[in-house]
Amino acid sequence: RDDVESRGLGDVYKRQFMYDAPSKSKHVNQAELDYIEQDNREAGSAPMTDEKDEKRMKFWQCFSYKQTWAFVFGKFMTDGVWWFFLFWTPSYLNTQFGIKTSDPLGMALIFTLYAVTMLSIYGGKLPTIFINRTGMNPYAARMKAMLIFAFFPLVVLLAQPLGTVSPWFPVILIGIGGAAHQSWSANIFSTVGDMFPRTAIASITGIGGMAGGVGSMILQKVAGNLFVYASGTTMIDGKEVEMTKELLEQGAQFVHPAMTFMGFEGKPAGYFVIFCVCAVAYLLGWVIMKALVPKYKPIVLE
């Protein structure tokens, strides 16, 4: 406890007496300052002002701007896809292929999934390339990049069909979808700084983060219920329960038949449906964002 308290007091001391804004710090040279503030000097960006001189946006006032709702819907529509890939992929491998993540093959597949996802580290560079080459404003550059990234998750539509050939195909395709999400995510967060004054960025980011969390919760809940429904049900000791492979092998009869979709039956059919949702979520999110904020319009508090 004493150690925690001493560290806390140390942090307070550093903040109060040692920290200074980069523009005022004697330890930051001009080259470093230019690098820190480069985003604020991009074409079309609002002029720099001292944060103390900026007017504050009240929390409820945030909801009166279309720019807020564009960010909210962009997060709501897409965050759940990322968490679905992370949370359900191990279960998918076990259900579809009988591969456990504790098996050597399962470990190799999960490692490959995350390795492919790391391609997203290049996603944040694309808007800068557009700005430098065409001189477009930051918001337009990021939206153009996000549209490109929104097409990549469409490959997830092929996860189930190609999964009949090898488990490596869906894992790689899901990894590409995950990489596209991270590239999308890096840019959608940056649109907040493009459109809102610095004093409002934390509030808008928090609102969007909550919307993403709600969207994630809904998608995971719907997916779980869909997988149970897709499996069909049987009667055990007078109770209706989910049909499993083991019960089916023991001769259990369906009370409600397994779901079929595009040639797949049972849980694989359910996964196919959710993969379709994940594949188009980014394009739908982009269309909503573009409809709400068709052109770059920074908010200026008066």
Regions found by a protein language model. Give the residues of each.
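Single conserved hydrophobic/aromatic residue that forms the stacking wall/gate
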Residues: D2-Y13
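Multi-pass alpha-helical transporter architecture, strongest
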Residues: K14-M18, V156-L162, K267, Y271-E302
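Juxtamembrane intracellular "pre-TM" segments in multi-pass secondary transporters
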Residues: A21-V72
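Extracytoplasmic gate region of multi-pass secondary transporters
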Residues: F63-K125, H181-S185, F189, S216-G224
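Interfacial helix-cap and linker-helix signal at transmembrane-aqueous boundaries
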Residues: L93-N94, L126-P127, I131, V222-G232, ...
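Loop-to-transmembrane helix entry
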Residues: G98-V116, A141-R142, W168-I172, S203-G206, ...
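A late C-terminal transmembrane helix in Major Facilitator Superfamily
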Residues: S120-I121, G193-G232
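C-terminal transmembrane helical hairpin of 12-TM major facilitator-type secondary transporters
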Residues: Y139-N187
